[in-house]
Amino acid sequence: MGEGAISEGWRGGLARFLVLYAALYGAYGLLSPILPGFLAARGLSPGQIGTLLAAAGALRLVVGPLAGAFADRRRAARPVLAASVALTGLAVLAHLPGAGFWQLLGPALLYAAGTAAPPPLADALALAAARGGAVFQYGWVRAAGSAAFIAATGAAGWLIGSYGLAAALVASGVLFIAASGAALALPVRDGSAKAGGWLGRNFAELLRLPRFRRILFAGSLVIGAHALHDGFAMILWRGAGIGAGTAGLIWSGSVAAEVLVFLLAGPPLLARIGLPAGIAVAACAGALRWAVLACTTVIPLVAAAEALHGLSFALLHLACLGLIEATTPPELRATALALYGTVALGLSGVLATLASGALYGAFGASAFWAMTALSLAALPLVPGLRDR
C-alpha cells in the first residue's frame, strides 16, 4: 500500500480504530481469564459459576443479533457500539461490591448483554472504513486487538499479584469505558434510519442468501473444532509432563501466530488465493493441528502444530469477514456479522465444548481426531462460496 493510501487511512480513522480495538480487547484480556476466579473468591460454588456463565452465554446469543439488527435498522452502529461498551464497563465495576450468587447475578447478566454486540459492530464499522483494503487493512486493527489481549492478560497477573483480584476488574472496567469514548470518536458514517419494521426481517433477508448460510456453517465447523483444544490442551500437556512455563510459551506462540496472520500474512495470502480458498486452507490447517495433538506430546511437534492457529483461526476470520462483506448488503452488515459471531461461532463453540468433555473423558488425546473430522467437514462447502 502506497504512502498516499496510508495517509488516507489515517485520515479515514485507522488510528481511531487501532485505539478502539486495543482498548476493547485489552479490557477483555484483563477480565476473561480471571472472572471465574473472582466469582469463586466472592463465594460462588463451581455449580453456581457454571450456571452464571451458561446464563450469560445464552443471553449473548439473543442480545447480539438483536443489537446488530437494531443498529442496521436505525443506521446507528457507532452509538450502539459506544452504549454497549459503556454498559459493559459499568457492569464490570458493579461486580466489585457484590458477594454471593444473587448479588452477582445482575452485574453478570448486564456484562453479558453489554459484551454481545461490540465485536461484530466494531468489525462492521472497521470493514466499512477500510473499503475493501483501499484505505487500510482490517487485519491491522484486528491484530492490534489480539496484541492488546495478550498484553492485558499478562498485566492482569501483575495487577492481581500486587493489588488483588479487584484491581484487574477496575482496570478492565476503565478500559471498557475508554473504548466507549473511542467508539464515539470514530468517523461518522451513520446514515438515516430505515422505516420501522420487524427486526426479524433482517435475519430473514440474510438467511435467504445461500452463500451467507454456507459461510455461517463453514465458519462454525472450523471454529467449533477449536473447543476441545481450548478446554483440554493444557490438561493434556501437563498430564504428559510438560511444565507450566513451557505450556504457557506454546500457547503464547499460537497467539503470536494469530497476530502475524492478521497483521502481515493474511491479507496478501487471501488476495492471492481468494477468500473461499482461505477457508479451505484454514480447515486443512486445523485438521493437521488436531491430528498432531491426537498423536503426540513431543514439544517441538506440538509447538509447530500450535503455530497453525494463525491459519485455523485468524485466516478463517479474515476470509469469513471478507466473504460476508462481498455477499451481504451494506445495510444488513452489522446483523450479518452479529449472526456470524454470536450465533454461528458462539453457538457452535458452546455445543462443541459440551461434546468435548465427554469425548476427552472417553478417549483422551484421541478425541482430537473428532476435531480433525469436524474441520474437514467444512471443505465440501467451499465450492459453494465462490462467485458464480
Cite the ranges covered by each PLM segment.
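Hydrophobic core of transmembrane alpha-helices in multi-pass small-molecule transporters
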Residues: 22, 91, 95, 101-119, ...
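Helix-to-loop junctions at the C-terminal end of transmembrane segments
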Residues: 62-76, 160-161, 261-274, 360
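Cytoplasmic helix-loop-helix junction between adjacent transmembrane helices
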Residues: 108-144
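Structural signature of the two symmetry-related core transmembrane helices
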Residues: 79-93, 173, 277-292
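Symmetry-related core transmembrane helices of the 12-TM Major Facilitator Superfamily/SLC fold
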Residues: 167-185, 366-384
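Juxtamembrane intracellular "pre-TM" segments in multi-pass secondary transporters
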Residues: 2-11, 183-221
